[in-house]
Amino acid sequence: MPDAVGAIDQGTTSTRFIVFDRRGTILAQAQREHEQIFPRPGWVEHDPREIWRNTHAVMREGLARAGLAPEDLAAIGITNQRETAVLWDRRTGEPLHDAIVWQDTRTDRSVAALARDGGRDRFRAVTGLPLASYFSASKLAWLLDHVEGARAKAEDGTALFGTIDSWLVWNLTGGPDGGLHVTDVTNASRTQLMSLATLDWDEAMLGVFRIPRAVLPTIVSSSAVLGEARDPFPGVPLGGILGDQQAALFGQTCFSAGEAKNTYGTGCFALMNTGPAPVASSAGLITTVAYRLDGRPPAYALEGSIAITGALVQWLRDNLGLIGASSEIEGLARSVEDNGGVYVVPAFSGLYAPHWRDDARGLIIGLTRYANRGHIARACLEATAYQTREVLEAMERDSGCPIAELRCDGGMTVNDLLMQFQADILDRPTLRPKVSETTALGAAYAAGLATGFWKTLEDLRDNWAVDKRWHPHIQAEERRALFAGWSRAVERSFGWVEENA
């Protein structure tokens, strides 16, 4: 009987394969990085062939390290960087162009032109998303318009489009020899082409971006047996697909409305389960699909993205030289009792949710002769917590549903000082799970549920365990004063970049 599940975690900088047992414990993993390609300023690309080669390699390496054979796997799940666009030839399996990565801004002008007629929110009621080059639709439109012969191939079904999950599934299940062309609802919801109401491609959106329906994958559930892998693990069921942030929500077992997680990395991604109906946002958030289990209604989510959190620590290290390694920031921040009145607003390229101010720029404010390196370090950590509070308060306003606690994952959660301050400024507990790889775990859970390796969502909840829990310690007046100072600092960051300057 199979006693493990494998998860492919295909991220922006690397690809991993992680093997989990029935308790959700990691048995083994393997990882390979891939090249970041920057053809022009603002352009970011990946080589889809390199990503597939790396995926193939880490699957074999990870399984070998676990001491298992393919027949020991009950299923394979996939989680992936979202929005990144791939276009390939179904006959040869060759990409028609390098993948255009979610960070890429080459379509800013075309998106701005669309926004002039109806504003950036003109399609939010259908897709849940503001108009932005971030999402896949404008990237696919660019590929069809700029790659020779691409539009004709798309119209006759010779060319196939997908986000990275689609590319991997197609190759895993045979490629040119009968490979499946599918994507799940979470990834489809990030293209700006899917209706949140029907969970199908929206004809009006296809018309706006001039996308032939023949090029698009079939939209499937996040947890369902899609088929069997052929290479490198013949016969192993492919049972689940989730975009990376939705996978983290699933891995944190946030299955009920009002349950939320925040992933702390270079930036932060906070998601809140809002239940079986989409919740429109008037507070600067994105409405998206959280997941859909096979044969059941979908769960929806509100999402808030924060551009700069962990990257601020890197900036202290690399640009200012205040620390020699990122791990040193906690010790430096603990060298002072508080922030000394100092605030850092990391608006290096504007502010994301909930403000969405392109004209904001970073600032350090509140400096006096008393302030020292420790105060600046502490203010940098606190900036992450303040921004997270802004997003969670927006979620509560939009949904009308209180968030009782925040489940935290990602690299920054090793910083106990940050986690304590997060609890303090939120006035609610923050929790770090024992299994830190929640994104890959979410993909494994989705796949294992589909094949019966785990029977119910309650089985997954039983697996979830707390590594550490932080409760708020500061008084209400101190909390109010700290956040008021942050709010004043944020306001002063606005308007620094003048229009047409």
From Swiss-Prot:
The reaction(s) this protein catalyses: glycerol + ATP = sn-glycerol 3-phosphate + ADP + H(+)
Entries under SUPFAM superfamilies matching the protein: Actin-like ATPase domain
Record: residues binding glycerol: 82-83, 134, 244-245
Residues that bind sn-glycerol 3-phosphate: 12, 82-83, 134, 244
GO cellular component entries: cytosol
Record-linked InterPro entries: ATPase_NBD, Carb_kinase_FGGY, Carb_kinase_FGGY_CS, FGGY_C, FGGY_N, Glycerol_kin
Record carries keyword Transmembrane helix: no
Transmembrane region(s): none
Example GO biological process: glycerol metabolic process
Annotated metabolic or biological route of this protein: Polyol metabolism; glycerol degradation via glycerol kinase pathway; sn-glycerol 3-phosphate from glycerol: step 1/1
Top-level enzyme category: transferase
Documented activity regulation: Inhibited by fructose 1,6-bisphosphate (FBP).
NCBIfam families according to UniProt: glycerol_kin, PRK00047.1
PANTHER family to which the protein is assigned, alphabetical: GLYCEROL KINASE (PTHR10196:SF69), SUGAR KINASE (PTHR10196)
Protein name: Glycerol kinase
Source species taxonomy: Bacteria, Pseudomonadati, Pseudomonadota, Alphaproteobacteria, Hyphomicrobiales
